[in-house]
């Protein structure tokens, strides 16, 4: 096989991949890899294979090809290749829950120059996800902030979408469900502009899975089940084992909570789904997935022991201890904390005072290490649905406490680090609304000529003869995509509206009660019940600006942006906007090897 034919096989693999013939595409790339002599072509093909195996949930295979990329980059002594190889290594280790190595390789990628200005943004994103896996929430927010700065500078909407999903996952963990739903809604708004069928399905599947988790925690079980079912179907179509197993776990969680009010058989189905999901996670060596499933199984066993034949406190204790063991191996402190809290309750039921005290001390220590408490009221957050606020220094507080504190201070500083109290534009829900066009316009960023950091960009230029019927979304399918995205956004809007009405009812119920604080003087009910900005008020702030008279928020750090728009558009909640009939069927930003 000549070099020209080998390169044609490589390009044919790209066509097959976008047609969702994943196995055939991988086979083509492997064939061409055995024949190619050019180092750059081999590096690009290795990137394709790493990307494809990551999308399939085969993370050990992805790691193998990333290591081959690193060896090739070292042999060539090419800094741009090293930057990309380090990034793929960081992604592989993050997926394998080896977060320490993910952080090391992510930082190594940032230390090398890249041919594509977007590559550092994906390195920051991977670092943020690694910090999130280790429950280092402050460092996680800092890395998300850095990634969003790159996304704004390069107009990379797919990077912005993944940051939205990451922030949605973060605030779901911290139990600020309103913010989590807002970020996931923005991700859905961005994904509408992605009309490459397989890429659209890939990200929509990811968003719907996280959406099902947030909706379940909010109590919208019907909407959560609908989102989870759709995500599971897309995961099967895409061949993504990792997302499919997580969907099974999420669906089991939903059935578990439905079973509390419906039937014993529902919980039995839930337990069977946990076992199926756990087997898939073990087979894929997905440690983070194992921890998620074990944590859900332990919670189910701890709360619903009477529904299982022969199950007692001892079995629930064993599941929690097994979950702690694996979570400690990967450094996931947040899951360990939840297990210790459950163990304390179980030991209390068994009247084992010593073990109960040990579990509570461990939970208290982890709470301090993760700083899961508000400096103003002294109370933990992350236990119930509460509105939180992050400052530019990435410290997090109860939004109500922070707002009251800053109103009473002339020197507006963070109480933890004493830095100036500046709301983070990228994670604040109080930012100005960007234009709808800015959110829905596709990225126009391309890699510089000759760049190898994002190989699929150059591949797209070479494959300009791809037929729309074969690889791009047809008009009928495009309309279906838009209708599906609009349906998803409507689902989130309904949930946010219900959440807002619940918050309003709670605020009215305590309108005559003062809110004391150990560090801040007590405020009156009119100040304590200050309206908290939710998704609904964010998306309609221009229609209610005269109705709500709020005190001014803390100052923001001035920053530049195009067309005088805010530096981030993730806080914008645009209405659905169909694409023009004569417009392009594909976004100009082609999926790259960094779009994992």
Swiss-Prot record:
TPR repeat residues: 6-39, 43-76, 83-116, 121-154, 161-194
Annotated keywords: Metal-binding, Repeat, TPR repeat, Ubl conjugation, Zinc, Zinc-finger
Post-translational modification: Ubiquitinated by the BCR(kel-8) complex in the absence of unc-29, leading to its degradation.
Disulfide links within the chain: none
Summary of the tissues where the protein is detected: Expressed in muscles and neurons.
GO terms, molecular function: acetylcholine receptor binding; protein-membrane adaptor activity; zinc ion binding
Protein name (database record): 43 kDa receptor-associated protein of the synapse homolog
Organism: Caenorhabditis elegans
Organism taxonomic ancestry: Eukaryota, Metazoa, Ecdysozoa, Nematoda, Chromadorea
Gene name of the encoded protein: rpy-1
